[in-house]
């Protein structure tokens, strides 16, 4: 017997269309975390991330035909829906939302070696500065950082998500890294480099 957890997204979608609720639950559990994380990194707000995540999967349930497997895998489609929903939320509030004061900081904490509280504090402060710097980026730069650096999405899938050329993703990411280095330098928090290695600590 093949359990739904072992099936690919396309087969799980086929089963879901046929009325298999468990198949949809597997899809949700597989993609909910990354979609929530992306929405949180884009908005800085846990409440927005919760709303966006719910809206993404409600949209998928309402109309499965919106996803065309011939145009790519399910993940870029879901990220694309999340991207549009985040933009709508931010347009409604008309300002960039800072991290909620009651955010669960444990969800962002890097894993550090025990026995070095000063080093841990310095690292936390640096990552906090990096996180805040990401939130100040223009949305078209912030989204490529979230997709390519934080979610480690390929340039091709990021291009499908955003709806632009791969070259545009590369140039935006390069520009975003330059802006982040400048912002961190201005805050006296310049890392040795900004890229996937430093970003992994935020996920």
Predicted features and spans:
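Structural recognition of an alpha-helix C-terminal capping motif at a helix-to-coil junction
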Residues: 51-58, 72-84
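Helix-turn-helix DNA-binding module
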Residues: 7, 132-168, 182
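N-terminal module of bacterial RNA polymerase sigma factors
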Residues: 1-34, 118, 182, 189, ...
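Sigma70-family region 2
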Residues: 17-18, 44, 55-71, 92-94
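Arg/Lys-rich amphipathic alpha helix in sigma70-family domain 2
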Residues: 62-66, 80-101, 123, 175, ...
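Amphipathic, Lys/Arg- and hydrophobic-enriched alpha-helical face
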Residues: 28-46, 63, 134, 186
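Short, charged helix-capping/linker segments at alpha-helix termini
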Residues: 1-3, 15-26, 37-55, 166
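Internal acidic/polar
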Residues: 2-6, 96-123, 154, 196-203
């Amino acid at each position: 017997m093949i359990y739904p957890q072992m099936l690919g997204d396309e087969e799980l979608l086929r089963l879901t269309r046929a009325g298999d609720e468990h198949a949809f639950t597997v899809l949700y559990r597989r993609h909910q975390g990354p979609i929530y994380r992306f929405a949180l990194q884009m908005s800085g707000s846990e409440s927005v991330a919760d709303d966006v995540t719910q809206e993404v999967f409600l949209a998928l349930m309402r109309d499965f035909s919106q996803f065309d497997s011939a145009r790519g895998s399910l993940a870029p489609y879901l990220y694309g829906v999340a991207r549009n929903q985040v933009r709508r939320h931010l347009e409604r509030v008309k300002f960039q939302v800072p991290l909620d004061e009651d955010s669960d900081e444990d969800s962002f904490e890097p894993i550090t070696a025990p026995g070095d509280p000063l080093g841990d504090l310095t690292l936390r402060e640096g990552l906090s500065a990096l996180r805040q710097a990401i939130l100040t980026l223009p949305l078209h730069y912030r989204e490529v950082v979230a997709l390519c650096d934080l979610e480690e999405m390929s340039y091709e899938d990021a291009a499908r998500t955003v709806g632009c050329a791969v070259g545009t993703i590369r140039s935006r990411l390069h520009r975003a890294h330059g802006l982040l280095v400048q912002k961190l330098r201005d805050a006296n928090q310049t890392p040795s480099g900004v890229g996937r290695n430093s970003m992994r600590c935020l996920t």
